[in-house]
């Protein structure tokens, strides 16, 4: 009996994570998510209506929850060890099929989407069961919480594949509700995570989303490259760079340190759930909506945007900023009035953006974001310096912003 135990222990320890550094396989896995994001943008671009935007965001929400589950998983399991690597490759293949079926996920490829999505989620649970076999608290969370919500969500998406219209939309909505409501219903106790690794994974996925906005510029400019297209491309890069700055200059640093300081267990898990699993979705969704707006702007520089597209470009950026406001409230319990006011102004400008030439609307967006960054950098220069260069002063720096 003892010999069996001594041989089992090394096999288990070989797949448990020992380092906070993001591994190459995790980055490789995220490349599939790049395609999935691109496909969500393509779905909305093919149907530039309010319904099309709703479908794209619903798919993005479902894909995000699958990805977020793997972010939690790889805080426990080393994806590059043992059979875990092979299961991760299989999950990548399933995720790729999901991404390929996204553009027609509500029609001809609905059943394929549901089956492939189910495979992604099953692989996720299988690896968590492996990692939790000597951890009763984690195993209980996996079986009762994750297993239950996953079964309901996947089952509803499968049922939705057999329907259409309002019933299909309702089934999708309930599936999303089960996924996102599960962690609140079953609680955050029992889960494990490595704070620095977890924060870094989400920062990298936001970079991937921002990369999609750059790709959208290139796709939208696939034609005659005249002066208007060049100016629009430069403004598009400026907007994407501004969104990068707003997150990575200070916010990401403070949030990562705050998560690392949280007491391991329930406090840290709830903070990770709220700040990263939940609040990074509207950030990513905002960037995806912006990418849609950039693509259409580059295609029609001198024309006005459709109302839904204007709302996507300015409203998506506003969503990104509002997510930052909520992110800060959850992390350091203070309110950022400057980003909130900028988001509100962008929402008010949507009707104007729908009648102006697309290039003018993009210029207004770039100008407002630039003014916001300059204001914060000048007004809070000392606090910014403490956060970026003096970690000991970080705790008092962010709340003053």
Regions found by a protein language model. Give the residues of each.
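Short, amphipathic C-terminal "tail helix"
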Residues: 353, 367-377
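Loop-to-transmembrane alpha-helix initiation sites
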Residues: 166-169, 358-367
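Membrane-helix boundary connector in multi-pass membrane proteins
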Residues: 330-334, 349-362
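Acidic, carboxylate-rich catalytic segments that either coordinate divalent cations
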Residues: 400-401
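Alpha-helical transmembrane segments of multi-pass membrane proteins
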Residues: 32-42, 357
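Short hydrophobic/alpha-helical segments at membrane-entry points of transmembrane helices
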Residues: 109-113, 171, 361
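Predominantly late transmembrane helices and immediately cytosolic-facing juxtamembrane segments
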Residues: 2-23, 27, 35, 44, ...
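Extracellular/periplasmic helix-loop-helix junction of adjacent transmembrane segments
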Residues: 45-50, 54
